[in-house]
Every structure is written in C-alpha cells, then in structure tokens.
C-alpha cells in the first residue's frame, strides 16, 4: 500500500482516526523508497531502523490531533546533522561521520514528531548544480534518467518528485533548493537569510546558506517552513523576527498584487521555450488580478562573478577544519604533519571542492583581497540596493528559476563556468538574503520549468499567497513523471 498521493492533511486525518498507524505509514514510505530509489538514486542513507523505532514510540505515545506533522515521514539533505545517522555532505572527507548532535532544524522536526527516513544525495559540500559531484553516487532526474536533477540538493528534489516522500529538507547557497525544484517539477523555497537556524548545517558559504523545504504542493511547503523557522541562540545569524503562520495568506486572491518582471531575467542566455513558459505564467497571474510590470535590476548581471568570489572565499575558510586530524578522512601513507594535511585534503576532497577552495584562497590572499573579495562585497551591496528599490513599489519579483530545463548528465562536467551560469537567476536572491520559491509552471521539451517568485525580507507569506493562487488554477503540480505513474 502506498500513501504518496495523499497530502499531509489527509495523512494526518488517517493517523488521528487510527485508520493507519505511524509505523504503517513509515513502512509504506520505506517500501516506496525501495521500489523507486533505483530509478533516481536520491538517498545516501536510508535510516530504516531509526525511523521505525521513532514511529513505534509515537504510536505508543499516541498521535497528537493538534500537531499536523505528527508521524509524517520526510527526507533530509546529507549536509544537515542527524545524531547517530551518517552525515557525509556527499564527501569522502566525511564518508563515515556520525554526528553526536542534531541540527536545530532536525530538533524542530523531532519536536513535532516527524520521522526522518533517510539522508539525501547532493553535490559534495553543496558545491555544484547537478548532483554529479557526490562521492557516493549520481542522482538522476525524476522525469528523465539521462538528465541531471539539478543541485546541490538533487536528492531532496528527486525524493519528492519520484513519490518516495511528500517532504524533504535541502539547503540553498546560490540556488541549491530552487534549481533542482525547477528541474524536477516540485515546490522548493529558500527562506529569508536568518529565518531558519544554520546550526548543524555543514557550512559552505556562511553569509549565503539557508535550509529550506521541498514539497509536492505550496501549502505543504508552508506547513514545513512553519516547523523549522525561528530564532536559535546557537546561531548568531538567526533572526529575532516573529514567525507567522506561513499558510495564513494561502487561499487569498491576488487582485491588485504588484509583481515585477526584471528585463535582465528574460535576456541573453535564457532558453526561448523557458522564456515562453514564464511569460505565459506572468499572463496567468495577470488573469488572476495581479499587475505585472517590467523593471530593471541592473547589477544582477554581476551576480555570478560576485557569488563565486564570496562563496568560494567563505568555503576556503569553512573547509579549513577538514584537516585529517579531528575527524573525517585521514590519508594512510603519511610521514609527517604536512603529509596529514596535504594528502588527507587532496584525497578527501573532490575536484570541484578543491577548485573552489583554491579560488577562495586566491581571492582572500594579500595583494588580491581588495581587487576581488572587497570589490565583490561592494557589488553585492549594489545588488541588494537594486532589490530594495524594486520592493519599494512591488510586492514580488518573478522570473524563471533556471535559464534552461535539465541538461544531459555529464554534459557540463568539463566546463565549470557553464554550470555556474545555470545559477544566474537564483544567485542574486542569496546575495541579497531574500526569500525565493520555485513552483512548477509548465514544460519545455517534456521537462519541467520552474517559475521563481522572490519576496521582500521575511515576507515568505506573500510568496506563498501568489504561488498558491497560481497552483490552484493550474495543473502542473499534479503531473508526475511517467516512470512513477504519470501520463504521457
């Protein structure tokens, strides 16, 4: 028996009425994973024993009728710490690492009696846009196994798209939730920087990283964000901003809502079919009463260059801790301390991670700091100011999530710059610390196209309002990959 077609509210109703138990729901989810995993390779670890133990304990305690998430299974990206469960960041460096603590976001999941069924595959240390940089396996697109699933949270996206789980957590540093959500036709949100605690997230770019939810529908996405949001004294960058119920505006109409469409988001490098799909989505939002107008974000064209200086610089600092001494991989053929560092890091890190460490170390080095890192910080401020000007007049910004649909596995491995440019439309949102969502908006060449909606700081509720209005009047979110029961 499978329950992957039921919403969280429907599953909650079944659990409360005792028509199914938490153990039965968990067993059904694990069965879905066993049946579907081979086609997509979403998981690094399936935590069957731990999940069933938590479900059994919950059945003994009883499902809380007032807690929507009680007994609901989900998957978690493998750079989010889970006590006693492998947390590898998809790297040889951490191939056997079992944390002795839970990330704050995981504590919040457990606090709502949610059940983690496994840890999902990703690009190593979240560095990549295709999930091909994993030490363990290559995740495949849920719609076409010859295409990339996007990255770095490819496993979290495909686990939802393939019907293995209804919900998952990912992390987003430059588009790592939104781009794979777009490529796999699911909902993925990057919250405002500081909305969700980063404590227990294996750091990549500390001024950019955010944990966020993947889901089948907009409302379920908001329901999961409700669980993981809030201030955390263990994370000095987490915000004191009050956390609303993110479902509050879902169902409200969008008449009079002002939405900006930046001309830079529809320019050079954007696939013509993707452009057509997004313009059709904009027209649809207008038919629902929204006012869509063209604007300019003039400094967004510098986003990719700025991002790869800042993110790589932060990564080169953050990844210094992986030295073969405290924990993680240590090379065997060593004769002195220098060997420990050089050989362990050379063997433990993959090519893309080493590339970014070198890029970041160069950008921070004396003689180059002012020309690169300092200058990137100044341009980042200009990008923030561009967004601030637009949000003085507009409620939301829309555009494509990615410039293309999913591309062939292996096609960009030798051209890192081409892969970096795939984040052209998502990176500025991270640089400005803004919230952004990708929702299914149509298809091009039989592959999903994501619509990105960007909101002002801490205004995820308005994003969800518009996204839900679009979803309620279209059928794109209901379409499933043929391999997993969808229609041709």
UniProtKB/Swiss-Prot annotation:
GO terms for cellular component: glutamyl-tRNA(Gln) amidotransferase complex. Its EC number is 6.3.5.7. The keyword ATP-binding applies. The active site is at 77 (charge relay system), 152 (charge relay system), 176 (acyl-ester intermediate). Keywords: ATP-binding, Ligase, Nucleotide-binding, Protein biosynthesis. It holds the Pfam family Amidase. GO terms for biological process: translation. Coiled coil: none annotated. The keyword ATP-binding applies. It catalyses: L-glutamyl-tRNA(Gln) + L-glutamine + ATP + H2O = L-glutaminyl-tRNA(Gln) + L-glutamate + ADP + phosphate + H(+). It comes from the Bacteria. GO terms for molecular function: ATP binding; glutaminyl-tRNA synthase (glutamine-hydrolyzing) activity. SUPFAM superfamilies: Amidase signature (AS) enzymes. Transmembrane segments: none annotated. Disulfide bonds: none annotated. It is an enzyme of class 6 (ligase). Belongs to the amidase family. GatA subfamily. HAMAP family: GatA (MF_00120). Allows the formation of correctly charged Gln-tRNA(Gln) through the transamidation of misacylated Glu-tRNA(Gln) in organisms which lack glutaminyl-tRNA synthetase. The reaction takes place in the presence of glutamine and ATP through an activated gamma-phospho-Glu-tRNA(Gln). Heterotrimer of A, B and C subunits. This is Glutamyl-tRNA(Gln) amidotransferase subunit A. It comes from Streptococcus gordonii (strain Challis / ATCC 35105 / BCRC 15272 / CH1 / DL1 / V288).
């Amino acid at each position: 028996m499978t329950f992957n077609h039921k919403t969280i509210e429907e599953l909650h109703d079944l659990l409360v009425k005792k028509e199914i138990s938490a153990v039965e729901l968990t067993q059904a989810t694990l069965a879905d994973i066993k049946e579907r995993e081979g086609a997509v390779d979403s998981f690094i670890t399936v935590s069957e024993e731990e999940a069933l133990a938590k479900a059994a304990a919950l059945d003994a305690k009883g499902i809380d009728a007032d807690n929507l998430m009680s007994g609901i299974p989900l998957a978690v990206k493998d750079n989010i710490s889970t006590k006693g469960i492998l947390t590898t960041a998809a790297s040889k460096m951490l191939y056997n690492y079992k944390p002795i603590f839970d990330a704050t976001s995981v504590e919040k999941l457990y606090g709502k009696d949610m059940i983690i069924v496994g840890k999902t595959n990703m690009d190593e240390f979240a560095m990549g846009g295709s999930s091909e940089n994993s030490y363990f396996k290559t995740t495949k697109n849920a719609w076409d196994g010859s295409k990339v699933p996007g990255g770095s949270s490819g496993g979290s996206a495909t686990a939802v798209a393939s019907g293995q789980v209804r919900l998952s957590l990912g992390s987003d540093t430059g588009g790592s939730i939104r781009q794979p959500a777009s490529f796999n036709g699911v909902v993925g949100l990057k919250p405002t920087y500081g909305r969700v605690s980063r404590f227990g997230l294996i750091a990549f770019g500390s001024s950019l990283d955010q944990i966020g939810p993947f889901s089948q529908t907009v409302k379920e996405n908001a329901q999961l964000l409700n669980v993981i949001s809030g201030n955390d004294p263990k994370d000095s960058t987490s915000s004191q901003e009050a956390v609303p119920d993110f479902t509050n505006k879902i169902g409200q109409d969008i008449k009079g809502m002002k939405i900006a469409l930046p001309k830079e988001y529809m320019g050079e490098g954007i696939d013509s079919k993707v452009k057509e799909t997004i313009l059709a989505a904009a027209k649809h939002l207008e038919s629902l009463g929204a006012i869509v107008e063209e604007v300019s974000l003039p400094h967004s064209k510098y986003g990719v260059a700025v991002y790869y200086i800042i993110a790589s610089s932060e990564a080169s600092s953050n990844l210094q801790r992986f030295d073969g001494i405290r924990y993680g991989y240590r090379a065997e053929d060593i004769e002195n301390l220098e060997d420990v560092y050089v050989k362990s890091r050379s063997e433990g890190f993959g090519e893309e991670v080493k590339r970014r460490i070198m890029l970041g170390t160069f950008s921070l080095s004396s003689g180059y700091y002012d020309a690169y890192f300092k200058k990137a910080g100044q341009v980042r401020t200009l990008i923030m100011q561009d967004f601030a000007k637009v949000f003085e007049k507009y409620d939301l910004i829309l555009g494509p999530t990615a410039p293309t649909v999913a591309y062939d596995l292996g096609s960009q491995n030798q051209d890192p710059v081409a892969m970096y440019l795939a984040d052209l439309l998502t990176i500025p949102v991270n640089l400005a610390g803004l919230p952004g969502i990708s929702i299914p908006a149509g298809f091009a060449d039989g592959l999903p196209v994501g619509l990105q909606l960007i909101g002002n700081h801490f205004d995820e509720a308005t994003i969800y309002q518009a996204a839900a209005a679009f979803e309620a009047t279209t059928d794109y979110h209901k379409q499933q990959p043929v391999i997993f029961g969808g229609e041709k």
